[in-house]
Amino acid sequence: GIGLSANQVGLPFRMFVIGGHPQIEDGKIRNCFNPLIKDFSQETVNMKEGCLSFPFLFLMINRPKWVNVEYTDENGEKIEEYLHGMTARIFQHENEHMNGYVFTDLVSKLKLDRGKKAQAKLIKQTIRRQQERLRNEVASKNVKI
């Protein structure tokens, strides 16, 4: 994952962590307490997103291209930043978790149903690949099952 909100793991804090992933432009890890989106672009970008709360589910989500944000970091310092690209997208996604929304709320029922069908197919493919990998590993060691 590229981000995780405290409430996703049962913690009662208005906080999330983003970063530490090659897709984050500056590679920076941000610990965001009491985050706020102060402004956002009218220009949007439609892009495929996933979420740790919904394994193997990927949906096209339209989001503002940039956001101006404010949060308190782990040292108690108030930070204001202009974020763009994947960093802006992830900040928005995690902020929604804290506000009681998940990315499935942002698409139509039809798009969600299509996404769930693709999710089921991807899960089956992953299981088959793992089974094949294990069979090959066992066979290479001449282990009888």
PLM segments and residue spans:
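Positively charged
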Residues: G1-I145
